[in-house]
């Protein structure tokens, strides 16, 4: 973060964060520019930057045309010239006068902010508030929005009624970062975006101040890996005293005045040392005694608090070659934390806002140790070095100073404590100047403070002219609190130890209600299609509540601009279809991809497009990702932070390895957050639904909690308690749930909207037709629905339709017979949960669970709850606590704890909840358990099989009716929930549904572009809409589009050749040029699949269409087929295009980028031996490899024989 220091007691060039504030346009102390008057420059939006000239003595400068006057700024080393246009935004005069330059004064009186006797004038405050609010909304690109206008009105109303206003937390974070960014004396501002802001505005006492400060020191010190941070206490309020920290820094060494007038310790701290003694501190007698803190709450006497020794990290100083140096007994503390400056944001003044960074080595080695009015060790070291101190021409001071600085750097690096040398710091400042010139048109800078105290002209900043001015927000000086008449309460108080304060907080009921507010805030985001990611996110929220203040949000409820102000974000997300985000994560994904990062601030448009379209291509092996990841590894605390510089994050992805793009969206989010400057606390977690997903999530969640606690230095006592957070005894207790009778009955469509949190519409059945032969043992149906022209059911060919089916009535009735305490059959009920009370807070109360609408138990099991999917390990653990038979309890416990045993049981039996209860008959089944613990019944998605132009007001579906037996064909018969229901519908029956767009699976807008369509079985569904659309183009628009090629596959030509007559008709009318069919079970013919047709009959055409004619290829079907087709196309391109297989893979990647290779992939269609054994074997081998050493949830990069992400 650069160096932050207490300026009031250490004048001169800064250390620490270097946040001195010498101001005034004439405060520059460098070489004088030959231009006596300011030049004219363009408007602030486009600052003029002439070409850099290599000849510093004669730079070429083209004077811009007429425009406002701005300072011309020259770099005398490079000869380059820029214009500072940002200074036009300064609203405050500097300390200088027309006749007198005061730029070299350390504390010009004009720059000190003194408490005013009354509140500031309302119009003055409003002017500053408007300016700041405008800055904030401009920064988030919402300037002029409705939210912006409403916020301005809100501030104006608050000022009118109270004389002041309050910042939102995001505004406070933005303001604190901007104040650092605007600090003219700080040399380390390149890291301004990484400032961690702790909001302590709820603080009400000196004791609470001390707790916050201890947390700040612990977080910022971070065992030597220092992190920049600021803690902001309540703002100055009219008619009330201030919160103040009397010490100039949180950590300082005492200075003891001796009888002979000398000082033992640090002479800069004599006054505060004597004040501490007056307030009860028992002093030591060492040269490096850490001072206690004097903290003052409004209108109260200051209180004294002793910092615990383990909180203060110190570094003993030694020299890499001078062995005697260690014997000098020198040391210095690691954390520079300025605590006596005032933070001003939008006219609001925060009189206590300690901030910290890390040291620049010269501040310790030159200023603190060598200054004559400080430790003054220069001559002692020179004598030990045998230097001639009798004459200045021996340069003994310079030689000794260099060795002392070398010792400081060596010692800090040896102790692994963050520090930066003055050369690296000044080079980074030049980068910052360049960044700011491009971003804002200038940068306020005080040359006298930016140039380090040694090696002046050896650093690049010495040769750089700078312009000094005041911007808001800002850090400002303020008078010492013990000086003047403003101090109240001069009484002496007894010192309080850290342990006393901690115990006081622990036992004080009045403080318990505010403890949560003091915790670090965590945001948990989820995106889910089935609800499982949401369930995991809620479990994560319960875990993090042990030590953090978490909130759980769906991605579509979250404003992505808030990421810039977050401290900790955890993401739990699934991946939909072909590597896409779930629907409720699409807006988040789009906004995340639009943000710019520190290593790709100006990405080419095609890179943005690639990132937005191909989430599945964001992997560790991508060249773009590898490039910026390498830059990030090479970066340091002297490099620019990204937009998310203060963000720490963890990501967990849910998916199925049956899909080729396993957890692709989670990988994209994880990669993108790091690219934008966020810090990954934990490796990406992944859970495979085919094998051990819940176990993987539990392991990842505990590891994420542990890493977060360590990062934010919280929750030591919570780590042990978190070990059993996933225990069923903790997650569900019978006595905490009850049913309450509700007056209102269920209306199905509003109920589905409530449950699924999305718009739903009702269509009605026109017809249901079996497309297979009557001789076939299987069924594929064409379902025609009437949409009644509803706008919400408008679609384009290639889109999906979501159907909300009910469970089979027989299954529901059988399950109801097992419920131990069912409510009356016709009574609408709701679940209520007992919320715990808190000491000093509200008492325990019953709160309605909002997951389900009021309905009967039968309605809940029919329309809203999933009773056919195998119960999760978590639900089995819960059922084990309700089993009365010990053997059944043990078996359920074993199934829930042994991932392999569970997966074998699940895949062999694929049991419904009813079958589980039949296997374990002693399990009691309370009604509240069903209503709160069963997963939601999810919509089923189908490709739309029609074109709206061909069938206005209708939507068609092509559905394979699913029926199979479990247990190797010997178990009970299972039916597809939705397909079986659809097959039984009659004309006029209602169907709740909605449209989900598939913009990446659409016909090209140019009808003359050639297309190849590949879809076996029900994979032909979206292509029916395609050929209907093309027929409409031919017959209604008179177009002659390029004939398409269709590759279809089925078992037998006489049984399941879907839409054969329609396809033949479309071919005759010019839609298709070629139609080829692969039969896998045709009598007296070899098995043939669609990929065989591509390889043997269409190889040349595939290459020509994709590589020469810029055509498109569409593939629709299950994951195994899509993967085989992809591999076949890759081999065809390699063979026909005379290239290596890897090169052909790159070509396919480009085709995907250009949206010319399209896939519409669905999961395992039937539980065939071939598919399940292959996928599960792979999953188990991965799991067993993890058990041999790797964590079971960690990201596995693709190997040479495995599909990519």
UniProtKB/Swiss-Prot annotation:
* Entry's localization field: Cell membrane; Membrane, Caveola; Cytoplasm, Cytoskeleton; Golgi apparatus
Give the GO terms filed under biological process for this record: arginine catabolic process; blood coagulation; cellular response to laminar fluid shear stress; mitochondrion organization; negative regulation of blood pressure; negative regulation of extrinsic apoptotic signaling pathway via death domain receptors; negative regulation of leukocyte cell-cell adhesion; nitric oxide biosynthetic process
Sequence segments annotated as region (Disordered): 1-73, 820-847
Q: Domain of life of the organism in this record? A: Eukaryota
The residues listed in the UniProt record as binding L-arginine, with positions renumbered to this chain, are 249, 358-359, 363, 368
The enzyme class is oxidoreductase
| Residues where (6R)-L-erythro-5,6,7,8-tetrahydrobiopterin binds | 104, 448-449, 462
Q: What PROSITE patterns does the record point to?
A: FAD_FR (PS51384), FLAVODOXIN_LIKE (PS50902), NOS (PS60001)
The Gly residues compositionally biased stretches are 15-27
Q: What cofactor does this protein call for? A: heme b; FAD; FMN; (6R)-L-erythro-5,6,7,8-tetrahydrobiopterin
According to the UniProt entry, which residues carry Phosphothreonine? Answer: 497, 1177
Q: Which residues cross the membrane?
A: none
Q: How is its activity regulated?
A: Stimulated by calcium/calmodulin. Inhibited by NOSIP and NOSTRIN.
Q: Which residues bind NADP(+)?
A: 778, 1018, 1051, 1080-1081, 1087, 1089, 1091
The Gene Ontology CC terms held by the record are:
caveola; cytoskeleton; cytosol; Golgi apparatus; nucleus; plasma membrane
Question: Which keywords appear in this protein's UniProt record, sorted alphabetically?
Answer: Blood coagulation, Calcium, Calmodulin-binding, Cell membrane, Cytoplasm, Cytoskeleton, FAD, Flavoprotein, FMN, Golgi apparatus, Heme, Hemostasis, Iron, Lipoprotein, Membrane, Metal-binding, Myristate, NADP, Oxidoreductase, Palmitate, Phosphoprotein, Zinc
Extract the GO molecular function terms from the UniProt entry.
calmodulin binding; flavin adenine dinucleotide binding; FMN binding; heme binding; metal ion binding; NADP binding; nitric-oxide synthase activity
UniProt keyword annotation of Iron present: yes
Kindly provide the PTM information from the record: Phosphorylation by AMPK at Ser-1179 in the presence of Ca(2+)-calmodulin (CaM) activates activity. In absence of Ca(2+)-calmodulin, AMPK also phosphorylates Thr-497, resulting in inhibition of activity. Phosphorylation of Ser-116 by CDK5 reduces activity.
Q: Which residues form the Flavodoxin-like domain?
A: 522-705
According to the record's subunit comment, the protein's assembly and interactions are:
Homodimer. Interacts with NOSIP and NOSTRIN. Interacts with HSP90AB1. Forms a complex with ASL, ASS1 and SLC7A1; the complex regulates cell-autonomous L-arginine synthesis and citrulline recycling while channeling extracellular L-arginine to nitric oxide synthesis pathway.
For this entry, the protein name equals Nitric oxide synthase 3
* Natural source organism: Bos taurus
Q: Which gene encodes it?
A: NOS3
């Amino acid at each position: 973060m650069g160096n932050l220091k207490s300026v009031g007691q250490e004048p001169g060039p800064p250390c620490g964060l270097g946040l001195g504030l010498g101001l005034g346009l004439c405060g520059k102390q460098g070489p004088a520019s030959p231009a006596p008057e300011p030049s004219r420059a363009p408007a602030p939006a486009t600052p003029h930057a002439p070409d850099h000239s290599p000849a510093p003595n004669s730079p070429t400068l083209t004077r811009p045309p007429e425009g406002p006057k701005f300072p011309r700024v020259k770099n005398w080393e490079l000869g380059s010239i820029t214009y500072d246009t940002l200074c036009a935004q300064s609203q405050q005069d500097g300390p200088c006068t027309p006749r007198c330059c005061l730029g070299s004064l350390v504390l010009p009186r004009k720059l000190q902010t003194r408490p005013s006797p009354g509140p500031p004038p309302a119009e003055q405050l409003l002017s500053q508030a408007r300016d700041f609010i405008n800055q904030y909304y401009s920064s988030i690109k919402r300037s002029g929005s409705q939210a912006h206008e409403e916020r301005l009105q809100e501030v104006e109303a608050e000022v009118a009624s109270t004389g002041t206003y309050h910042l939102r937390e995001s505004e406070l974070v933005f303001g604190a970062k901007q104040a650092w960014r605007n600090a003219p004396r700080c040399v380390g501002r390149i890291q301004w975006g990484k400032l961690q802001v702790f909001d302590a505005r709820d603080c009400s006492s000196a004791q609470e101040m001390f707790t916050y400060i201890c947390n700040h020191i612990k977080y910022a010190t971070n065992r030597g890996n220092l992190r920049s941070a600021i803690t902001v206490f309540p703002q100055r309020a009219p008619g009330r005293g201030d919160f103040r920290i009397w010490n100039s820094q949180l950590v300082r060494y005492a200075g003891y005045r001796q009888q002979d007038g000398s000082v033992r310790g640090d002479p800069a701290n004599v006054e505060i040392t004597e004040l501490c003694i007056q307030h009860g501190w028992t002093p030591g007698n060492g040269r490096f005694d850490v001072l206690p803190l004097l903290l003052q709450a409004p209108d109260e006497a200051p209180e004294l608090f002793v910092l615990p020794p383990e909180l203060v990290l110190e570094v003993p100083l030694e020299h890499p070659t001078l062995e005697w140096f260690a014997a000098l007994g020198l040391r210095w503390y690691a954390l520079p934390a300025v605590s006596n400056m005032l933070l001003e944001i939008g006219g609001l003044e925060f009189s206590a806002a300690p901030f910290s960074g890390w040291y620049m080595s010269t501040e310790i080695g030159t200023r603190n140790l060598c200054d004559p009015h400080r430790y003054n060790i220069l001559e002692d070291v020179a004598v030990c070095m045998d230097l001639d101190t009798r004459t200045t021409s021996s340069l003994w001071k310079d030689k000794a100073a260099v060795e002392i600085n070398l010792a400081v750097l060596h010692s800090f690096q040896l102790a692994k404590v963050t520090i930066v040398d003055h050369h690296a710091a000044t080079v980074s400042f030049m980068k910052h100047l360049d960044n700011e010139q491009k971003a804002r048109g200038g940068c306020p800078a005080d040359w006298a403070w930016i140039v380090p105290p040694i090696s002046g002209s050896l650093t690049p900043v010495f040769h750089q002219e700078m312009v000094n001015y005041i911007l808001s927000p800002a850090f400002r000086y303020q008078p010492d609190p013990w000086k003047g008449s403003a101090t109240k309460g001069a009484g002496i108080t007894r010192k309080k130890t850290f342990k006393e304060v901690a115990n006081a907080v622990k036992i004080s009921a009045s403080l318990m209600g505010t403890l949560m507010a003091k915790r670090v805030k965590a945001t948990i985001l989820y995106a889910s299609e089935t609800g499982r990611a949401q369930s995991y996110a809620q479990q994560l929220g319960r875990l993090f509540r042990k030590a953090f203040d978490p909130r759980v949000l769906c991605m579509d409820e979250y404003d992505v601009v808030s990421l810039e102000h977050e401290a900790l974000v955890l993401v739990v997300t699934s991946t939909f279809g072909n590597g896409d985000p779930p629907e409720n994560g699409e807006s988040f994904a789009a906004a995340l991809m639009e943000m710019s990062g520190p290593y790709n601030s100006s990405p080419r448009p095609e890179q943005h497009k690639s990132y937005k379209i191909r989430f599945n291509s964001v992997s560790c092996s991508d060249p773009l990702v590898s490039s910026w990841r390498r830059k990030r590894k090479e970066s340091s605390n002297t490099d620019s932070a990204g937009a998310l510089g203060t963000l720490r994050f963890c990501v967990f992805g849910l998916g199925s390895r049956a899909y080729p793009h396993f957890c692709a969206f989670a990988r994209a989010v994880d990669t993108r957050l790091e690219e934008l400057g966020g810090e990954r606390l934990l490796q990406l977690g992944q859970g495979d639904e085919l094998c051990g997903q819940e176990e993987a999530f539990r392991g990842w969640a505990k590891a994420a909690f542990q890493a977060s606690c360590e990062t934010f230095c919280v929750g030591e006592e919570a780590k042990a308690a978190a070990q059993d957070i996933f225990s069923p005894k903790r997650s569900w207790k019978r006595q905490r749930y009850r049913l309450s009778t509700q007056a209102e009955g269920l209306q199905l469509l509003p109920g589905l909207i409530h449950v699924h949190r999305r718009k739903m519409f009702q269509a009605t059945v026109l017809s249901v037709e079996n497309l297979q032969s009557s001789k076939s043992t299987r069924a594929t149906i064409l379902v025609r629905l009437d949409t009644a022209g509803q706008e919400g059911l408008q679609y384009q060919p290639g889109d999906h339709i979501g159907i909300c089916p009910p469970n089979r009535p027989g299954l529901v009735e059988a399950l109801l017979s097992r419920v131990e305490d069912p409510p009356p059959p016709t009574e609408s009920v709701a679940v209520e949960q007992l919320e715990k009370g808190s000491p000093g807070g509200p008492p325990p109360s019953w709160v309605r669970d909002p997951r389900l609408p009021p309905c009967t138990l039968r309605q809940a099991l029919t329309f809203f709850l999933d009773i056919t999917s195998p119960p999760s390990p978590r639900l089995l653990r819960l059922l084990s606590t309700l089993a009365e038979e010990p053997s059944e309890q043990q078996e359920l416990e074993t199934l829930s704890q042994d991932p392999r045993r569970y997966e074998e049981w699940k895949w062999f039996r694929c049991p419904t909840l009813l079958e589980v209860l039949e296997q374990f008959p002693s399990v009691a089944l309370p009604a509240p358990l069903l209503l709160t613990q069963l997963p939601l019944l999810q919509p089923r998605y189908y490709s739309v099989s029609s074109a709206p132009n061909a069938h206005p007001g209708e939507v068609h579906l092509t559905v394979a009716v699913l029926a199979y037996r479990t247990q190797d064909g010997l178990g009970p018969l299972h039916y597809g929930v939705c397909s079986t229901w659809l097959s039984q519908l009659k004309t006029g029956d209602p169907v709740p549904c909605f449209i989900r767009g598939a913009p990446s699976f659409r016909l090209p807008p140019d009808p003359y572009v050639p297309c190849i369509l590949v879809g076996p079985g029900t994979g032909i569904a979206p292509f029916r809409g395609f050929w209907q659309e093309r027929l409409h183009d031919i017959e209604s628009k008179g177009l002659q589009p390029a004939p398409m090629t269709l590759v279809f596959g089925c078992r037998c030509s006489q049984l399941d050749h879907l839409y054969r007559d329609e396809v033949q008709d479309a071919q005759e009318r010019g839609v298709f040029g070629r139609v080829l069919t692969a039969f896998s079970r045709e009598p007296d013919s070899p098995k043939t699949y669609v990929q065989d047709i591509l390889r043997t009959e269409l190889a040349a055409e595939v290459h020509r269409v994709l590589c020469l004619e810029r055509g498109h290829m569409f593939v629709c079907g299950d994951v195994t087929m899509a993967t085989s087709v992809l591999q076949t196309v890759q081999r065809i391109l390699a063979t026909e295009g005379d290239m290596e297989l890897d090169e052909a893979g790159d070509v396919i990647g480009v085709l995907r980028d250009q949206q010319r290779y399209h896939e519409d992939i669905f999961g395992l269609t039937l539980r065939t031996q071939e598919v399940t054994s292959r996928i599960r074997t792979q999953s188990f081998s991965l799991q067993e490899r993890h058990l041999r050493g790797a964590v079971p949830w960690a990201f596995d990069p693709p190997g040479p024989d495995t599909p990519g992400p």
